[in-house]
Amino acid sequence: MRKKLLSILLVLSLMLALVPAAFAADIASGTCGAEGDGSNVTWTLDETGLLTISGTGKIASGTGGSIWSDKPVLAVDIRSGVTGVGKDAFYGCDDLQVISLPDTVTQLDDNALGNCPALSDILVDAKNPAYKSVDGALYSKDGTVLVKGPANAETFVVPDGVATIGDYAFFGAKYLTSIYFPEGSLTTIGAMAFEFCEGLTELLLPAGVTEIGMYAFAHCSGLRSVDLPVSLKHVSDMAFLSAGTMDAGIADINYAGSEQQWNAIAFEDGVLGWMHKNFNTEQHTFGAWVTDGTRSCAQGVTMARSCGNDGCDLVQTVELPALGHIWDSGTLLAAPDGVRCGIVEHTCGRCNGTGYEVLDPEIWAYEQFGDVDPTLWSYEGIQFCVMMGFMSGMDTHVFAPRGVTTRA
């Protein structure tokens, strides 16, 4: 059924379902509970690409990828009662755009949402005690840990107050070209946090960062320049493995401290040892971000911050697009029939705004009367009058009386 959208904002949205729930049929189902939970956790996938997971217990870990990686999953709705998401549970769901977590999910295992390149939004129930969502990204409830960023983002600004970029936070975010870190709060870059972010070309790690986890920037093939602060104390195994390419690797490591201080850093491997290093480089110290508005479903913002060092005129400017509505599958207010359009009311999962959708009238199959010539100009009018109850045939195949219907 072709659908028309009344709200222009609907064009900008990511739909949780492509047709109203009343019209969507399930195409697959099964169980997905972790060991001990077994059949207590069930799933259904409907024809719109909406995967609904319900029950009690934890979703099982993936084995070499998600059990749904070969299915057309566009959105995931995890219902209250599910308590956790296993390792690699949704790994490799290439088309997944939106996932919603209920109040009861308090555990996400390693890379549960890994390698989902289209993922733009993670929504969290406001009553969840462990997690919260801000602009589509997933954070610990207190906002100090960035658990998972939007995988399809090109630019991301880590907000003030974040102390840790979690393990796998941007793993495989192949579209990411720019990442901006907060001043004064960030201390730790987790394991595999930016692995396979091939679009990154530059890193400016702020003062205060003390630890870089294993494989944190491994296979970032586009990386050319890295600024490291004097606060750095520990760099884990293979943190920059295969960063840059064989022909054009990282050109410069700019370190704010002395060579003696560099040698005191605990490196677990020699990946950075052969790279060219510039010591005692001046480290940028940025002020607070200034924005020209509030980012919302319908409105983007421009952000800017300046380096406060004497003689430095560097200004970082970032344009962030509107977030876009995330519509639910909708409530059918009026069903379409052979004459009237139907109306579906959608609610945005992010801003609680309302949008309306118009469904075209049903194309009813005309009943075939043996005594009414389908080529007559009056044929469709007769069928319409029968269907609307204005008149009826003698039986299901005879309209009667016989004769030619003439124009008035």
Please annotate each region the language model reported:
Residues L14, W43, I53, V76, ...:
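Extracellular/surface recognition and adhesion modules
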Residues L9-A17:
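Bacterial N-terminal signal peptides
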Residues V157, G161, E282-W364:
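Extracellular modular ligand-binding repeats in secreted and cell-surface proteins
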Residues D46-T56, K71-G84, D94-Q107, C116-G136, ...:
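Structural signature of tandem-repeat unit edges
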Residues L16-A28:
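Sec-dependent signal peptide cleavage junction
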Residues A25-D94, A169-G172, F196, A218, ...:
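Surface-exposed repetitive/solenoidal architectures
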Residues L376-M388, D395-A408:
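Short, solvent-exposed alpha-helical surface patches in non-cytosolic proteins
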Residues K87-A89, D110-A112, D167-A169, G190-A193, ...:
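Consensus positions within tandem repeat domains that build extended binding/scaffold surfaces
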